[in-house]
């Protein structure tokens, strides 16, 4: 078999900037993404897929908000919304990819695994929630909801108030062994969507927690668990850059992991955007991976061939 690659799809694989997130818009984006992935599979790579879910979970939380306000339907907790989004997005990707493979005469099995991601209940992130989720509220509404629901709310960049939740570090996946066995049997697996549903182990039981896990860091854990050769993060820029957005901007094409770690520790990459992608790439190479890639979604095939994107090497 060819090299095994874990592909982490960014939000633009589902919803482009300026789009509202209708089913038709999303399906059109997913079909374009499926064509890229099918081409990678046609070239002999073994593929495992993970994806983001930010806008979709935000949408589900709004749906629940409206359902509760209008019809008195109880809202579900965040971990359930995460699981719902994995089913929703996984369904779209697996259907589009199966159809695209069939067009090429390739009969491959494609499945989505609702994945639970283990976090440490003592992770300091639980004491300092920072990840904004769901809709914006005015200050009065936000503080009322905080009292009623026990939420922590913070003002978000002058745009209004939002709920914030912890973003703990992923330690592994409950379903890791199952995913690995499927991959070894030639199944294309979609897993750890949106970073997976965050869970803790308490008194021998698995228990969901209200948190959000970074999908690239969780994707890196997935890459370790399936013994991937390559970990490829696809996003809406051409790779990682030093001094991004300034006159001194310098794109990184090929970089050794120790050099990239130095840039990371110097604070070159923003915490909410490129930072976790770079950290995930570093972790994968330090674990023993052959190559990590950060590249534009539309250039996935070229990036895998080393022609574009940021290529991170041992």
Curated annotation (Swiss-Prot):
It comes from Pyrococcus furiosus (strain ATCC 43587 / DSM 3638 / JCM 8422 / Vc1). Keywords: ATP-binding, Cytoplasm, Kinase, Nucleotide-binding, Transferase. It holds the Pfam family AA_kinase. It is found in: Cytoplasm. Homodimer. InterPro entries: AceGlu_kinase-like_sf, Asp/Glu/Uridylate_kinase, Carb_kinase. Its EC number is 2.7.2.2. GO terms for cellular component: cytosol. This is Carbamate kinase. PANTHER family: CARBAMATE KINASE, CARBAMATE KINASE-RELATED. The gene is cpkA. The lineage of its organism: Archaea, Methanobacteriati, Methanobacteriota, Thermococci, Thermococcales.
């Amino acid at each position: 078999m060819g090299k095994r690659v874990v592909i982490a799809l960014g939000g633009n694989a589902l919803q482009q900037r300026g789009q509202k997130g209708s089913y038709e818009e999303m399906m059109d984006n997913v079909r374009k993404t499926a064509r890229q992935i099918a081409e990678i599979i046609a070239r002999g790579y073994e593929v495992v897929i993970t994806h983001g879910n930010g806008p979709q979970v935000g949408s589900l939380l709004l749906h629940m908000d409206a359902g509760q306000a209008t019809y008195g339907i109880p809202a579900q907790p965040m971990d359930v919304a995460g699981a719902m989004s994995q089913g929703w997005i996984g369904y779209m990707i697996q259907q589009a990819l199966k159809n695209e493979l069939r067009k090429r005469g390739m009969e491959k099995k494609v499945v989505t695994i609702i994945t639970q991601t283990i976090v440490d209940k003592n992770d300091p992130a639980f004491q300092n929630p920072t990840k904004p989720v769901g809709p914006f509220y005015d200050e009065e509404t936000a503080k009322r909801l905080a009292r009623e629901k026990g939420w922590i709310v913070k003002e978000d960049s002058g745009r209004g108030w939002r709920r914030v939740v912890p973003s703990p570090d992923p330690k592994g996946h409950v379903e890791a062994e199952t995913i690995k066995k499927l991959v070894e049997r030639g199944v294309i697996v979609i897993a750890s969507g949106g970073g997976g549903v965050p869970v803790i182990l308490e008194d021998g039981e698995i228990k969901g927690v209200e948190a959000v896990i970074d999908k690239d860091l969780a994707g890196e854990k997935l890459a370790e668990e399936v013994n991937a050769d390559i970990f490829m993060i696809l996003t809406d820029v051409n790779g990682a850059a030093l001094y991004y957005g300034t006159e001194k901007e310098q794109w990184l094409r090929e970089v050794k992991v120790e050099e990239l770690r130095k840039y990371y520790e110097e604070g070159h990459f923003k915490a909410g955007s490129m930072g976790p992608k770079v950290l995930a790439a570093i972790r994968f190479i330090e674990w023993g991976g052959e190559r990590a890639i950060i590249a534009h979604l539309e250039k996935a095939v070229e990036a895998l061939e080393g022609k574009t994107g940021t290529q991170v090497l041992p």
